[in-house]
């Protein structure tokens, strides 16, 4: 689940199945629009890439599903970059702050993405491909034709097999390694697929459309709203308590207090919970995290969760990104509360 004061992501352990791409699928790949910002490479063109196999990967640095594909992309880049494969990462932002190039480049460095990147903040490449998904992969042959595509996670072996097929077409003498094994157990055939709470957006625009916020006060875009938690929580809905500014993309804390009395709460069923959050004022802020009314057990702690000397669990929000809050040892329904005593959590 993705929860943030921007949104909450309850991340499932699931894998997408390969789309049914016909064997004879063949569509000319569009040229990259002019005027794009390229990083980690000189500007590339489809015309100039003729003879290569090109994997165009649409990603977003706060997207958990994109992040889960990175180990496979890095493996393919390492194995096939000298055998004719060129990966082009197209970063198209979901949130306004993800348009900032510095944020994108820091994320690319942190994730170890070593291939050419396009900063697609105006959705130019996205529209050219008619794309609708993060992540999305389009595989292009030596003659510049899209021969395969996949949306979402999963189908890693099938995608790698298609890469090898097109590399063989480009160079029949090329020697290729075996298809890689699943990197995570949840990517293996037969892995359990749990019914998880869906992704939740807390901003007034998408949250209002989806009916995410369950408080009687509802959304009041542009205003600071004093919310009261009704106390009876339903699965998959968000409950706010305290003073929160309503914006299109986020709920933002506006009250500084001695104790963390303002909070966002949900009842969820998930193995993993992530949240996209940013420090609105550019300074680190602390968010306290409670699981079923108590600090998170260390066995269930996510990668970004910390503990103080009293065993209380918290996050330090020091940059706009996705924070991994919980990795539950056992799948179950739980309540999660994110509380703050500081200004500018959103």
Regions found by a protein language model. Give the residues of each.
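Non-globular targeting/processing and membrane-anchoring segments
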Residues: 2-38, 157-346
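A short beta-strand-turn-helix
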Residues: 31-54, 77-80
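Short, internal strand/loop/helix patches
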Residues: 37, 102-140, 275
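Short active-site neighborhood of thiol/selenol oxidoreductases, capturing the structured segment around
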Residues: 43-67, 73, 86-88
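Loop/turn elements at helix/coil->beta-strand transitions in domains of secreted/extracellular proteins
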Residues: 50-54, 82-86, 112-116, 142
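Structural microenvironment flanking redox-active thiols in thiol-disulfide oxidoreductases
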Residues: 67-110, 121-125, 287
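Non-catalytic, surface beta->alpha helical segment in thiol-disulfide oxidoreductase systems
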Residues: 131-170
């Amino acid at each position: 689940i993705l929860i943030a004061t921007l949104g909450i992501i309850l991340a499932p352990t699931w894998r997408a199945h390969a789309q049914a791409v016909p064997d004879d699928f063949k569509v000319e790949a569009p040229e990259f629009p002019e005027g794009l910002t390229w990083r980690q490479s000189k500007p590339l063109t489809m015309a100039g890439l003729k003879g290569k196999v090109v994997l165009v990967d649409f990603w977003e640095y706060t997207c958990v599903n994109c992040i889960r594909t990175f180990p496979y992309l890095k493996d393919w880049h390492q194995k096939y970059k000298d055998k004719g494969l060129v990966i082009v990462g197209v970063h198209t932002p979901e949130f306004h702050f993800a348009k900032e190039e510095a944020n994108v480049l820091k994320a690319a460095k942190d994730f170890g993405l070593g291939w050419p990147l396009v900063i697609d903040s105006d959705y130019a490449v996205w529209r050219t491909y008619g794309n609708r998904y993060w992540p999305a992969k389009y595989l292009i042959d030596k003659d510049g034709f899209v021969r395969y595509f996949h949306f979402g996670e999963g189908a890693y072996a099938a995608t790698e097999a298609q890469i090898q097929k097109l590399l063989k077409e480009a160079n029949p003498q090329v020697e290729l390694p075996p298809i890689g094994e699943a990197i995570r157990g949840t990517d293996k055939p037969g892995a359990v697929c749990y019914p998880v709470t869906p992704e939740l957006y807390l901003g007034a625009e998408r949250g209002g459309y989806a009916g995410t916020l369950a408080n009687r006060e509802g959304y009041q875009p542009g205003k600071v709203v004093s919310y009261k938690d009704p106390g009876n929580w339903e699965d998959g809905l968000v409950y706010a308590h305290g003073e929160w500014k309503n914006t299109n993309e986020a709920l933002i804390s506006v009250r500084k207090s001695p104790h963390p009395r303002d909070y966002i709460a949900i009842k969820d069923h998930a193995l993993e919970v992530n949240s996209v959050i940013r420090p609105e004022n550019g300074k680190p802020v602390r968010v306290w995290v409670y699981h079923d009314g108590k600090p998170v057990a260390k066995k269930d702690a996510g990668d970004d969760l910390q503990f103080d000397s009293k065993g209380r669990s918290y996050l330090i929000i020091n940059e706009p990104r996705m924070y991994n809050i919980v990795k539950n040892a056992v799948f179950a329904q739980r309540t999660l509360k994110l509380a703050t005593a500081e200004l500018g959590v959103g």
